[in-house]
From Swiss-Prot:
GO terms for cellular component: Golgi membrane. SUPFAM superfamilies: P-loop containing nucleoside triphosphate hydrolases. The chain crosses the membrane at residues 81-101. Glycans are attached at N364. It comes from the Eukaryota. It catalyses: dermatan 4'-sulfate + n 3'-phosphoadenylyl sulfate = dermatan 4',6'-bissulfate + n adenosine 3',5'-bisphosphate + n H(+); chondroitin 4'-sulfate + n 3'-phosphoadenylyl sulfate = chondroitin 4',6'-bissulfate + n adenosine 3',5'-bisphosphate + n H(+). The lineage of its organism: Eukaryota, Metazoa, Chordata, Craniata, Vertebrata. It holds the Pfam family Sulfotransfer_1. The keyword tRNA-binding does not apply. Its EC number is 2.8.2.33. This is Carbohydrate sulfotransferase 15. The gene is Chst15.
């Protein structure tokens, strides 16, 4: 069968390539363009039983379709455009159907060893006002995440099956000394008996024109604290003790440490506690010396630099040391042995958990577990140190941590995907290493897109309890602190053996607004998806249960928050 491409009329006979016939193009057909009207040969198009191109089919009309003339009078260009649009639409829909349902499961490649950590260097905390989350806003992606839950649950179950809270092997004192020869040469074995803080006098060999802070690394790398050190520099010579032509300066370490955790309210605790007249903190809120600066880590993304000597760390307590020195001098003049009640504190929220630098300095001879931890060195010098810990539901802590440190593209969807990726990476490590090895694995911590490991409180606390007694800890919950600030602060005062406050001082401390609240732009993002929350509760559940057992307090299981 043959047809006219111009007017689609049927032509006979079948074997002819050119034929003259009468025009049947209809009233609107252009007879000047039709070969039949002009007596010209008609151009034929063969239609057979073979599969035909889609565009060619639209240019052919078979018998009995004359009623479709109105549709077929579209220009060929418009018809082609319509067909191309339909094809593209079909391809897009087919692509979504084939791959869309699975794309949320596409996570990064398995665990690999990488370079130096790139996690944020600032370890800050969360305030009580951020404990409550915003109302839930549904998302299309949340539906597909729910469908993915069984697969993610398998990962969580795999991790839980390998959780073993084993006892770590403790290093002896000689091993510690070999690692930090200079530190052990600077800090003495005994401290002044008349000071609550661990202090001692050391000889200063410089002149009155000598700048004692000239080479301090905290000054060199941070412009923010130069004014503080300028003040210290001007008053330095007047706070020396002069005996038999020699000059001595008072050196001090903290009496207590706020050791963690980040995004759990440590900043708020710090701000309220420093209002007490008997408490003095370091010149910098979070020196991060024990965990980072003594290894030469200024910012994690910058890699290693020169190590900060212990003298630079001790300089941070000179303001407090000056006040303690004045009190000691006054007591000496009165010939009394009255205890100086000023205590020094330090509030680096990385102290409890961050041991990422160990792989660069210590021999890996313990199956991936660090042979030395931060608490080993603190205990070697200060076996009677007091330790404050503020904790929070680790599920909410992780989301707050994500909102604080993520720089762009923050959303509940992005958080869910990062959590899923981090869980897979953690499982991959657990397939080959112990729980402790994975928790302290620098490469893994660097690879995970969210700091999943920071919420494993039980692992860290159990390791701290290998060197310090439980009585040396005061462990608080942010949820309790948020609901009753006055009560938690009184517990802190009692733990640190601080004197009572006046009514005015107490009102100022308890009624001050919360510190370091969540940024407005982060609040507008709302909470995490319920399915993400469920996944994290499943993951952290066994660790929370163990923590509650250690502390003998079910509140730390966070079963209801």
């Amino acid at each position: 069968m043959r047809h006219c491409i111009n007017c689609c009329i049927q032509l006979f006979p079948e074997d002819a390539h050119k034929q003259q016939v009468a025009c049947q193009g209809g009233p609107h057909h252009s007879h000047q363009a039709c070969p039949s009207c002009k007596g010209e040969d008609k151009i034929l198009f063969r239609v057979d039983s073979k599969q035909m191109n889609l565009l060619a089919v639209l240019e052919v009309r078979t018998e009995g379709n004359e009623n479709w003339g109105g549709f077929l009078r579209f220009r060929k260009g418009k018809r082609c455009s319509l067909v191309f649009g339909l094809i593209i639409m079909t391809l897009v829909m087919a692509s979504y159907i084939l791959s869309g349902a699975h794309q949320e499961l596409l996570i990064s490649s398995p665990f690999h060893y990488g370079g130096f950590p790139s996690n944020p260097s600032v370890m800050d905390s969360e305030s009580p006002s951020d404990v409550k989350e915003h109302h839930y806003q549904p998302s299309v992606n949340n539906i597909s995440y729910v469908k993915d839950y069984p697969n993610i649950k398998l990962i969580i179950d795999s991790i839980a099956a390998r959780n073993e809270f084993t006892t770590r092997q403790l290093p002896d004192l000689q091993d510690l000394k070999r690692q930090e020869l200079h530190m052990f040469s600077v800090i003495p074995n005994k401290f002044l008996p008349t000071s609550k803080s661990p202090c001692w006098y050391e000889e200063f060999s410089g002149r009155n024109t000598t700048d004692p802070y000239l080479t301090n690394s905290y000054v060199l790398y941070s412009k923010r604290f130069r004014s503080t050190f300028d003040t210290l520099r001007k008053a330095f010579w007047g706070h020396l003790s002069h005996v038999h032509g020699k000059h001595f300066r008072l050196r001090c370490l903290p009496h207590f440490y706020i050791i963690g955790q980040p995004k759990c309210g440590t900043t708020d605790l710090y701000d309220r506690l420093r209002l007490h007249p008997e408490v003095k903190f370091s010149a910098i809120k979070e020196p991060h010396w024990w965990t980072r600066k003594r290894f030469g880590i200024v910012r994690l993304r910058d890699g290693l630099r020169d190590r900060y000597p212990v003298e630079d760390y001790l300089d941070l307590f000179d303001l407090a040391a000056h006040q303690i020195h004045q009190g000691l001098q006054a007591a000496s003049a009165e010939q009394t042995s009255k205890m100086n009640r000023i205590i020094i504190g330090e509030a680096s929220a990385s102290t409890m958990w961050d041991n990422n630098a160990w792989t660069f300095f210590y021999d890996n001879s313990t199956d991936g577990e660090p042979p030395f931890l931060t608490q080993d060195f603190i205990h070697a010098f200060q076996p009677e140190a007091k330790l404050l810990v503020m904790l929070r539901d680790p599920v909410e802590r992780l989301y707050s941590d994500y909102l604080y440190f993520a720089s762009s593209n923050k959303s509940a969807d992005d958080f869910h995907e990062k959590v899923t990726e981090a869980l897979q990476l953690f499982e991959n490590c657990m397939l080959d290493y112990s729980l402790r090895a994975c928790v302290y694995n620098n490469t893994l911590n660097n690879a995970m897109p969210v700091r999943l490991q920071v919420g494993l409180y039980a692992v860290y606390l159990l390791d701290w309890l290998t060197v310090f007694s439980k009585e040396q800890f005061l462990i608080l919950r942010l949820e309790d602190h948020a609901s009753n600030v006055k009560y938690t602060m009184h517990k802190v005062f009692q733990f640190l053996n601080l004197g009572p406050l006046s009514e005015k001082q107490e009102a100022l401390m308890t009624k001050s607004p919360a510190s370091n609240t969540r940024r407005p732009e982060d609040r507008s993002l709302g909470p995490m998806w319920p399915i993400t929350q469920k996944i994290l509760r499943d993951f952290y559940g066994p660790f929370n249960t163990r923590l509650a057992q250690v502390l003998d307090d079910e509140a730390f299981a966070w079963k209801t928050t």
